[in-house]
A protein has these predicted regions:
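Gly/Pro-rich hinge or "lid" segments in bacterial periplasmic/extracellular proteins
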Residues: 75, 151-203, 207, 217
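C-terminal motif of bacterial Sec signal peptides marking the signal peptidase cleavage site
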Residues: 18-20
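N-terminal lobe/hinge region of extracytoplasmic solute-binding protein
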Residues: 39-87, 118, 175
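Local pocket/hinge segments that shape ligand/substrate recognition
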Residues: 235-305
Length: 305
């Protein structure tokens, strides 16, 4: 029964805890020249935009962006695409925005976007999960034809998947479109970032240093000693301790869910009455209390869909 309960389809929207320097009654003044130092559990090991889960890491570090993304209200938005039109079962047309640039100042036009997406589709098989190997073809400077291998109902959602980041090859490595660029990388140890001058509001950003600290107790000590300005991805227990100390603790929705799927074809779970009994017997609010975060699922998809 424990295994049955463990794998019951009962997804919770995850939350991530982070803590920032300062106390609620005080406001620290930080000089413009002082970098913001962030501790989190990992730093990317290599700048390889089509290898495994690396594109997700590059985006979380502020270096890259997917073609579409989800805003805080659950809407699919894009800095790059003005309009998406479906022309038939397998074909779509993207109309691009003008003036959006890579961090080297060159424009993200149809040729650049099509090259990036085709490279992703060819080199990272994880990008083929939703609609097969998708093909992108330049029509003119700001128009791209998209042909999917398998039918999809929402191309925007596909283009928001973490594999589908925009990038190009430069003389000294890859060039991206996110709010920051790399100043220095010590693989899997630390990453120093500086603002991408071609990204909006770049003048409001300063240098950022991300340090990899896998041990939560060590991260807590580093924050308390002043080595870190922010500790990201801390556990609920440590978040509670720091909040009790008067530190500023915030939570954000992680924006994804985990699912457990039952085998209803054979065994005890093939009996609908058993499934209904387990469903009624579980107190989902107790799960949230035990996990110290999240929300009760209202279906297979996040509530904003």
């Amino acid at each position: 029964m424990k295994k049955i309960i463990r794998f019951l389809l009962c997804s919770l929207l995850l939350v991530i805890f982070f803590v920032a320097c300062g106390e609620k009654k005080e406001e620290k003044v930080v000089t413009e020249d002082k970098p913001i130092v962030i501790g989190q559990t990992f730093v990317v090991g290599a700048i390889e935009p089509t290898v495994g889960g690396t594109p997700w890491s590059l985006t979380t570090h502020g270096l890259s962006e997917t073609v579409f993304s989800v805003d805080r209200n659950g809407n699919l938005v894009s800095r790059y695409v003005e309009d998406v039109e479906r022309t038939d079962k397998l074909n779509w047309v993207l109309k691009l925005k003008k003036g959006v640039k890579f961090s080297d100042g060159t424009e993200v036009n149809a040729e650049a976007l099509a090259w990036a997406m085709n490279t992703v589709m060819e080199e990272n098989p994880l990008s083929n999960a939703t609609a097969g190997k998708v093909k992108f073809e330049k029509v003119d400077d700001y128009t791209v034809n998209v042909t999917v291998e398998r039918e999809t109902q929402n191309l925007k959602s596909l283009l928001a998947e973490w594999t589908n980041i925009i990038f190009k090859k430069g003389d000294n490595g890859y060039i991206f479109t996110g709010p920051y660029i790399i100043k220095n990388l010590e693989p899997e140890v630390s990453l120093t970032l500086e603002p991408n001058q071609y990204y909006e509001n770049s003048e409001k950003r300063g240098e950022v240093i991300i340090k990899a600290i896998s041990d939560m107790a060590s991260m807590k000590l580093a924050f308390e000693s002043g080595e870190l300005d922010m500790a990201f991805g801390i556990t609920p227990e440590i978040a509670g301790e720091l909040k009790d100390e008067g530190k500023i603790v915030e939570t954000i929705d992680a924006g994804y869910q985990y699912f457990g799927v039952l085998n209803t074809a054979t065994g005890i779970m093939s009996d609908k009455s058993v499934r209904e009994a387990i469903n009624l017997g579980l107190d989902r609010e107790d799960y949230i209390k035990a996990l110290k975060g999240g929300r009760v699922a209202n279906g297979l998809f996040a509530q904003y869909f």
